[in-house]
Amino acid sequence: EITTRLVGSEMCIRDSHNAEEMLSATGAVASTIAITSVYYFIAARIVLGVGEAGNFPAAIKVTAEYFPKKDRAYSTSIFNAGSTVGALAAPITIPPLARYFQSIGVGNGWEMAFIVIGGLGFIWMGLWMFLYKKPNVNPRVNAAELEYIEQDNNNPEESAEQQAAANDFDNKKISFLQCFKFPQTWAVFVGKFMTDGVWWFFLFWTPAYISDVYGFASDTGTAQMLIFVLYAITMLSIYGGKLPTIIINKTGKNPYAARMQAMLIFALFPLLALFAQPLGNYSYWYPIIIIGIAGAAHQSWSANIYSVVGDMFPKSTIATIVGIGGMAGGIGSFCINMGSGRLFDYAAETNMTFMGFEGKPAGYFIIF
């Protein structure tokens, strides 16, 4: 998935939105073969990663095409929250679906559940291929909407030459290797590398944390309720994406400056995770709420850093930079999750003590 972030982004450079969507739909194919053995499951997960990794660069580029700069973080936060909605819906839809197919004698139930869920990707691909058009050629976009979308290119204070230069900038082609010559590319790279691990650590390790510290197995009602609440809290990121627009409307700052101010605010909230473990001695709800807030802040921050790409690069290059940032975030997340697992194993084996905590809880406190 880390590598195919770049593949998907390169397809977007060529404006092959439909072709890229077809690649993303390969995730649906993967779902249908991940049902026989562990090895098939691993192979299917690889194919799924190839398909899903290209979706995000395409989504960011489409956001840049359909929204002015001041609204892009908000729109990004909305579609970014879609994965959270899916995570909330999965536990209450997929198991009943599997049980239904099992009850009517279709294998063990899970096989058909994989096929049905994977088939949704092809439906989405069809809608995308037949309905999506750029705003300037989309008959469903009226003149007023198009004027709003293109407001960044229609500044009355700019001369015709300046507007022409801005349009040329948006259409400028920058090769993949040339992107690495710009310090802005490395700013996005480092920003994603250093921060994506926060989200993926909490996403991956919170069920284990609930089990290790509080003894609630992931299939118990209490554990599922805690995870549901955590995901629900992260939905606050939608409102976080609105903050730059509010700052722009109230202060008149340019989109880039407003985004920097909003990102500084969001960057402070994950520090609350330092209190998750100590407060967890009183109730397991405290760490869940704190982790949810930290996750929401990270998602808001991430929506803004992706929107910053549109402030610094031409539209034709946005998908490439987003793909590079996604790759960096994947590498950083891999390092943090792998390192965390090793630390937790070491803490459990040695009964390590740290700041009043012993064993795995000590390891969790160090990572938090």
Identify what each model region corresponds to.
Residues 1-13:
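Single conserved hydrophobic/aromatic residue that forms the stacking wall/gate
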Residues 44-82:
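Cytoplasmic helix-loop-helix junction between adjacent transmembrane helices
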Residues 73-99, 230-238, 326-337:
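Glycine-rich segments within core transmembrane alpha-helices of 12-TM secondary carriers
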Residues 84-139:
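Helix-loop-helix hairpin linking two adjacent transmembrane segments in secondary transporters
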Residues 93-105, 210-211, 243-244, 248, ...:
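Interfacial helix-cap and linker-helix signal at transmembrane-aqueous boundaries
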Residues 99-118, 219, 258-261, 342-368:
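A membrane-interface helix-boundary motif in multi-pass transporters
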Residues 177-242, 298-302, 306, 333-341:
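Extracytoplasmic gate region of multi-pass secondary transporters
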Residues 256-304:
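C-terminal transmembrane helical hairpin of 12-TM major facilitator-type secondary transporters
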